[in-house]
Each structure stands twice: as structure tokens, then as C-alpha cells.
């Protein structure tokens, strides 16, 4: 069966998405900055769904690693779900631009970077699907977290 790559696999919604794809027979690549934290989930999915689950280290904010990361996936995934996200406190972002930049890089720029690589490959092969999971904060902007919200809306 085909593989589905889930980026940001530690989020609660990503974990449930992983379970659903596994129930439907898809093997999984679960990618996260701390993939070791996903061992219990991977073992549970393997037992319940009898599929392969491969844990992959991946930091969406490290753009220079994206090509090597995607090239390391064999076989290539049929589908990709991006659920990565980062939210610093609004005041932290206002007082420390590195927090703002990390928010934007994780929530928007990183997704664009990795998905450009993946979508080009899928287009070349005329096969595949991509799902982006964002946040209601991107739709319902609030002044209390406008940096996070705008990064999710982008």
C-alpha cells in the first residue's frame, strides 16, 4: 500500500489523521522535530491497523534540509498532510523578532518550501495529493494573536 507523509505529526489533529489513514490501509511517514516522541503512537497504529509506520526527524523551519528530507523518503508518499504549527505569545513576538520570524517560518514559509519540492515531484509523476491543516485563527483574526493568525491565514 502507498505511504502518506504527515508533517507536524505531534499535533493532536495530525495524530487522529494518522490513525484514519492507517485504518484505510495507508503506510505512514510521521515527521516531527522530535520524532522519538511519536514511538507510542507509531506502535499503537502498527498494532491496530497492521501498516508500516516510519518515524522521521524533520524541522520545517530548516529550509536547507527540505530537499534531502524528501529525497530520503523511499518510496515517495502518495499524499502529504502538513499540520505543523507554532504559536508564541503575542507579546513575545512583539518584543523579540526571532519569535515572530519562527512563527512565520513554521506556519507559512516552511510549508511553502517543502510543498514546492513535493508538489513538483507529484506533478511530474501526475499523482498525489496534498492537505494543509491550518487554524481557525487564520480565518478569525484577533488582535490578541495577530502574528500567529496572519501566519496561519497566509
Spans of features found by a protein language model:
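Rossmann-fold cofactor-recognition segment
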Residues: 47-63
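Conserved glycine-rich cofactor-binding loop
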Residues: 10-11
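Conserved mid-core segment of classical short-chain dehydrogenase/reductases
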Residues: 85-101, 144
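Active-site loop-to-helix junction immediately N-terminal to the catalytic Tyr of the SDR YXXXK motif
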Residues: 141-149
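Active-site helix of classical SDR
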Residues: 115, 151
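Residue(s) in the substrate-gating loop at a strand-loop-helix junction
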Residues: 135
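Conserved glycine-rich Rossmann-like NAD(P)H-binding loop of the short-chain dehydrogenase/reductase
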Residues: 26-40
Amino acid at each position: 500500500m502507498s505511504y502518506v507523509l504527515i508533517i507536524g505529526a505531534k499535533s493532536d489533529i495530525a495524530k487522529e489523521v494518522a490513525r484514519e489513514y492507517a485504518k484505510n490501509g495507508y503506510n505512514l511517514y510521521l515527521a516531527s522535530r522530535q520524532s522519538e516522541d511519536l514511538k507510542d503512537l507509531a506502535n499503537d497504529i502498527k498494532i491496530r491497523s497492521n501498516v508500516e509506520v516510519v518515524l522521521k526527524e524533520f524541522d520545517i523551519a530548516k529550509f536547507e534540509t527540505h530537499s534531502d528530507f524528501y529525497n530520503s523518503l523511499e518510496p515517495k508518499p502518495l499524499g502529504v498532510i502538513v499540520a505543523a504549527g507554532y504559536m508564541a505569545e503575542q507579546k513575545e513576538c512583539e518584543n523579540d523578532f526571532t519569535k515572530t520570524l519562527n512563527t512565520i517560518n513554521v506556519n507559512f514559509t516552511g510549508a511553502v518550501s517543502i510543498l514546492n519540492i513535493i508538489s513538483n515531484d507529484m506533478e511530474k509523476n501526475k499523482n498525489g495529493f496534498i492537505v494543509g491543516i491550518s487554524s481557525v485563527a487564520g480565518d478569525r483574526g484577533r488582535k490578541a494573536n495577530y502574528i500567529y493568525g496572519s501566519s496561519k491565514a497566509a
